[in-house]
């Protein structure tokens, strides 16, 4: 973790590598992280906005509207058919308690923190040998 007020650098992930990572995570039954990476790549949402999403917002819809946490702006996002299919597949495997439940819930039943997500992403980078310097 970086020091407060320090400058950090994030690196980019090549599109084909991102798509391969999404497929590998799903194949390994890590549907929560597969969904996280897919939503991040396809929508460009910040992690704080992804963590605030609920199943009823993204399941079986062509588009959805959110108010971004950081900027307070209203934003409408369209979901392509490939992502819609992946969301449905993840929903069926994750088996949440209901459609109003948050999409990313820990085993304890709480929403993941950003720090936990960063730790998990670091582990994913190592396990799947993702070619990227700074992953967040």
Residues covered by each model-derived region:
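Charged, surface-exposed interaction regions in soluble eukaryotic proteins
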Residues: 88-94, 132-134
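Non-catalytic DNA-binding core/recognition domains of DNA-processing enzymes
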Residues: 32-39, 55, 79, 117-121
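Basic, Lys/Arg- and aromatic-enriched nucleic-acid-binding interface segment
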Residues: 2, 12-43, 47, 96-98, ...
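C-terminal catalytic core of Y-nucleophile DNA break-rejoin enzymes
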Residues: 7, 69-89, 100-122
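Amphipathic, well-packed alpha-helical segments that form the structural scaffold of globular domains
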Residues: 22-23, 118-126
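Conserved tyrosine-mediated DNA breakage-rejoining catalytic core shared by Y-recombinases
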Residues: 17, 43, 52-85
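Active-site-proximal segment of tyrosine recombinases
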Residues: 49-51, 133-136
């Amino acid at each position: 973790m970086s020091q407060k007020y320090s400058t950090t650098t994030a690196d980019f992930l090549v599109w084909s590598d991102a798509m391969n990572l999404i497929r590998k995570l799903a194949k390994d039954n890590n549907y929560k992280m597969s969904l996280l990476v897919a939503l991040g790549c396809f929508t460009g949402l910040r992690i704080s906005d992804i963590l605030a999403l609920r199943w009823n917002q993204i399941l079986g819809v062509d588009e959805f509207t959110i108010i971004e946490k950081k900027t307070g702006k209203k934003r409408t996002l369209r979901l392509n058919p490939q992502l819609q299919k992946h969301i449905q597949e993840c929903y069926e495997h994750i088996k949440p308690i209901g459609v109003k439940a948050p999409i990313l819930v820990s085993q304890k039943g709480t929403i993941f923190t950003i720090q936990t997500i960063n730790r998990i992403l670091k582990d994913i980078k190592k396990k799947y040998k993702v070619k990227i310097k700074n992953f967040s």
